[in-house]
Amino acid sequence: MTDAEIARLLGIGEATLRRARASQATLDAATSDRLYRLSKTIAIAEEVLENGEGAMSWLRREQPGLGGQVPLKLLVTQAGADQVETLLRRIDYGVYT
C-alpha cells in the first residue's frame, strides 16, 4: 500500500504518518484502532485469496458483493470493515454473492 492510501485510511496526513513511522511514536487510540482494522482486514484478504498481491488488487477494485463499492474505501468505518470481512468469509466458503 502507498503512504497516501494508509494515511487516508488512518485519517492522518502523509507527513504525520512518516514522522510516526520514523520516530516509532505511539499512535492515539482512534488511529491505532483504524490501523488494527486495516491490518486485520488485509490479513483476512491475504488468507482467503491466498496471495498478497491478489488481495491488494481485490481490495482496490469495485466488488459486486459490496454493491460495486471498493473495499479499501469501506475500511474507514467499522461497519464498512465488517461488510468487507463478511464478504471475504463468504468467498472463503464459496458463497460469492
PLM regions with names:
Residues 1-97:
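Non-transmembrane "mature" sequence context
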